[in-house]
Each structure stands twice: as structure tokens, then as C-alpha cells.
Curated annotation (Swiss-Prot):
This is DNA-directed RNA polymerase subunit alpha. CDD domains: RNAP_alpha_NTD. The gene is rpoA. InterPro entries: DNA-dir_RNA_pol_insert, DNA-dir_RNA_pol_RpoA/D/Rpb3, DNA-dir_RpoA, RBP11-like, RNAP_asu_C, RNApol_insert_sf. Keywords: DNA-directed RNA polymerase, Nucleotidyltransferase, Transcription, Transferase. Residues 276-376 are annotated as: Alpha C-terminal domain (alpha-CTD). It comes from Chlamydia caviae (strain ATCC VR-813 / DSM 19441 / 03DC25 / GPIC) (Chlamydophila caviae).
Length: 376
């Protein structure tokens, strides 16, 4: 029987320190409805894994309010015209589908996610018509007289009045996910003349993702994930990404509950946490100055690796390409570097060191250290 009480130690995963949000070209710098998010570096393959999962969660998982039915004075069904109104009921229905309502169903709020009936009275007299040139447009803002809902597009025209009248209008608003046809919407207390609408609940309009190559130190075998998110304004792209991440985490937690060994990951070495002078003293050390087996020392010598700096800048896959360099030598070297608080594939760019100049830089730094010690 396996012992599940001890954690398993896994090699570190390269992870982004943060996700960068950028405005999309042509948006005027606004990120209210469109934004791109960049996450790098990610281990090879993780870009597509995360990108596809986030895209699906963004498209199907987010909730927002939408009008699911309406009733209006004198309207018996959706295939009729109304005297004094330019649009027939079919066009009014289409206009109501384009209404974008915004409200956060907070957990502690009185109504929460409950369906709400929003009633309004529209009164148009002769003076109103005269002021508008004979036709008065009734907008979404005119219909939201109660309920605490904001309108993303308050000037969206629902219908146009051409003669004095008074109308009683009731909108039924519900929260949901995705898209629901009128046939799938069931109203327990549906009114006799209440017309049920198709409802577009999802606030996300478009999601695309791209994966590019990026580098960590001298190793280019990593992913950069670029996620483009466009919403209709009921939530911002930043909110949409945060909400979808929580939805995925909720689903992944189901599988995490399996009674198996837990994994802990080695932490990446951060140069900022160490004194740079201390690190430089370690980097200029010769390979023969640390305690390695004869086999590992010979392997590094044959690869023309003379200093610790030349060793730690080398990506792990590249080391394994050298002749006679196997997993056993690799494991020994990694353990020794770990004791020194170093690791393979380190980014030494802040020291001005790259694969193309590491030898000469190590010699230069070694001479400076020796000169400093002599003067001291």
C-alpha cells in the first residue's frame, strides 16, 4: 500500500510572475470592452492547454442578465402592428433582444439572481411629439424605471411613437449562461399576453488565443500565451477572465480531491533574493573546484565547460546532447547546484552574460574579483 502522507517533490514549472493586460489597437486605449492578456513564460504545451480551457470557459461559463419576456398595452401576440407605433411587435422583440443590462447579483443582496419583473409607464403627449418632430423614440433607458439594472446601451431604441398615447410595459429579466431560445424558457406565472424572447445571456462576444515561442535565459523552448477577449460591456474583459478562471478552478477542484499523494514543486532561483556579489563569486568558480564525480567532471570538460557560470546558463536539454552525458550525471550536477542555491538554465542577462559571451565574461569577472581581493 502506498504512503499518501508524504508529498512528492516535482521539478519547478516556469510560471509568469503576472499577466499583462494591453489595450487592443484601434480601441483608443480603452479596455472596457476589448483587451489582450499576455502570460509568459509557460512550459511548452501549457500555452494551448490554458488558452483552450480559458476560451471555452469564457464563452460558455459567464452569466449576465437578459430580458426573457415582455408585455405591453394592446399587444396580444408578436405578429401584429400597433397603431401609433412605427415598429411592429416582431421588430420590437428584435430591439429588446439587443438590450444590454448590467447588474451584479451579489450574494448578500435581497434579490440575488432572482427573476425580476420591471414595470414602466410610457406617456407621450402632443408636446413631446412636437418637440421631436412628430416622432418620439422610446429607448431602453425609458423602460428601466425600477429594478436597479444599469443599461450598457441606454440610447438603444426599442420603438418609435407617432401619436399621443400611454403604455404600460413589463419586462421580465433573468440571469443565465450562454444563449437560450424562447422554447427553453419556462415561466411558471406567464401572463396571457406575455411574449417570451430568445435570450443572449453571455456577455462575451469573442475570444481568440495565440501561442508564440518565448525564452527563459538562453532556452527558447517556452510558450507565450496571448488571449484576446471582447465583451459587450456587461462585464469588462478583465472581469471576464477573472470569473472564467474561478469557474475552471471550481471544476478542477473536483479532481484534486482524489486521495493520492500531493505534489510540491521546487522553487525557481531568484537572483534578486541573493546578493549579486555572492552569486558572482559562485559563477566564476571552476568546475574542478566543486565536488563532482570524475565522470561528471570529464563530461563537462569534454563539453568545454570550465566554470559554474558556463554550466548554469546551459539549458538542461542542451546538456543532455553532449557525448556521454547521461541522466545520472545530470542528477548529480543539479543536486550540487541546488546546494549552491543555483540551477540550470539561469538567466544571467542582468550580469551582461549570454551563451555567446559567457566564457569571456566569467574570465573578466574572475580577474576583477582577484584584483579586488589583492587590493583588499
Amino acid at each position: 500500500m502506498s504512503d499518501n502522507s508524504q508529498n512528492l517533490l516535482y521539478d519547478k514549472f516556469e510560471l509568469p510572475e503576472s499577466v499583462k493586460m494591453m489595450a487592443v489597437e484601434g480601441s483608443g486605449g480603452s479596455v472596457d470592452k476589448q483587451a489582450s492578456f499576455v502570460a509568459e513564460p509557460l512550459e511548452r504545451g501549457m500555452g494551448h492547454t490554458l488558452g483552450n480551457a480559458l476560451r471555452r470557459a469564457l464563452l460558455i461559463g459567464l452569466e449576465a442578465p437578459a430580458i426573457i419576456s415582455f408585455s405591453m398595452t394592446g399587444v396580444l401576440h408578436e405578429y401584429m402592428a400597433i397603431e401609433g407605433i412605427v415598429e411592429d411587435v416582431t421588430n420590437i422583440v428584435l430591439n429588446l433582444k439587443g438590450a444590454l443590462l448590467k447588474k451584479y447579483p451579489f450574494q448578500d443582496s435581497e434579490d440575488g439572481r432572482c427573476t425580476q419583473l420591471l414595470k414602466s409607464t410610457i406617456s407621450v403627449d402632443a408636446s413631446d411629439l412636437a418637440a421631436c418632430g412628430g416622432q418620439k423614440s422610446i429607448t431602453l433607458a425609458d423602460l428601466l424605471q425600477e429594478g436597479g439594472f444599469e443599461s450598457v446601451n441606454p440610447d438603444h431604441v426599442i420603438f418609435t411613437v407617432t401619436q399621443p398615447m400611454q403604455l404600460e410595459i413589463a419586462l421580465r429579466v433573468a440571469f443565465g449562461r450562454g444563449y437560450s431560445t424562447s422554447e427553453r424558457i419556462v415561466l411558471e406565472d406567464k401572463g396571457v399576453n406575455e411574449i417570451v424572447l430568445d435570450a443572449a445571456f453571455s456577455p462575451v462576444v469573442l475570444v481568440n488565443y495565440f501561442v508564440e515561442d518565448t525564452r527563459v535565459g538562453q532556452d527558447t523552448d517556452f510558450d507565450r500565451l496571448i488571449l484576446h477577449v471582447e465583451t459587450d460591456g456587461r462585464v469588462s474583459p478583465k472581469e471576464a477572465l477573472a470569473f472564467s478562471t474561478q469557474i475552471l478552478t471550481k471544476h478542477f477542484s473536483i479532481f484534486e480531491k482524489m486521495d493520492e499523494k500531493k505534489i510540491v514543486f521546487e522553487e525557481a532561483i531568484s537572483i534578486e533574493k541573493e546578493n549579486k556579489d555572492d552569486i558572482l563569486h559562485k559563477l566564476v568558480l571552476g568546475i574542478n573546484e566543486i565536488e563532482l564525480s570524475v565522470r561528471s567532471t570529464n563530461c563537462l570538460s569534454n563539453a568545454n565547460i570550465e566554470t559554474i557560470g558556463e554550466l548554469v546558463i546551459m539549458p538542461e536539454p542542451r546538456l543532455l546532447q553532449f557525448r556521454n552525458f547521461g541522466k545520472k550525471s545530470l542528477c548529480e550536477i543539479k543536486n550540487k547546484l541546488k546546494e549552491m542555491k543555483l540551477e540550470l538554465g539561469m538567466d544571467l542577462s542582468q550580469f551582461g552574460v549570454g551563451l555567446d559571451n559567457v566564457k569571456e565574461k566569467m574570465k573578466s569577472y574572475a580577474e576583477k574579483i582577484r584584483s579586488k581581493n589583492v587590493k583588499g
